[in-house]
Amino acid sequence: IILFNSDYNPQNEQEYLDVVRRYRVDGVLAVPIRETSAEWQEYVKKLDVPIVTVTRRAKGLDSVYVDHIQAGSMVASHLLEQGFRRFLFIGKDYDGKYVGFRQMLVQMGYGEQTANLVYQDDVQLKQALELWFRQASERGAVFAGNDIYALRVLDALRKLDVFIPKEVGVIGFDNTSTGRYLNPRLSSVSQPIAQMAQEAVTRLLDRIEHPGQWEVLDYPLSAELVLREST
């Protein structure tokens, strides 16, 4: 087993895929760092080894993943039910989580009250959150693309003396263990990691042991809201 961690760096990801090609491995479990592009999909197909993508869907490749669009929509519905009326997503606008989040809010009439912010550093985040918070009096909510971003949001809001969730709600994604020990404890979205891993490994071994023509596996799983005090 060869394990690579790209550290969310696209260049590292590309280099590690090149290593996979050189070492002629038997199979690959890939966890793409971003939404898979057509170019990425074509490149990994040329590796000429069985490959299963995990956590994100890749067209034309076996994929075991959580439907991020559905998860984002679910988060939006929850925040609306809690009385929030302005919304900020921390992450890229092409992230499936934001796509589903925004689609639901547009459908409910809150498209103009919804925006996204790409994280650069803690100073930029604090300044952007302060500007967003001061712009309007309506109660707002921040949906962070992962729990790490959510922790940074909570820290920035505390430094701005913003009351959570009375003035601003915060929800993350991944449901990491850290969120349970914060004050307030962090609401988040949980992915069925064990099930994803089991299905992906089973599929990869089948591909390795029984090569040939297979129908492409498209295996979406549902995420689950884990609600705590931050929303």
Report residues per predicted region.
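Helix-turn-helix/homeodomain-like alpha-helical modules used for DNA recognition
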Residues: 1-15
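Beta-alpha junction/loop-to-helix N-cap segments that form part of ligand/metal-binding clefts
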Residues: 31-36
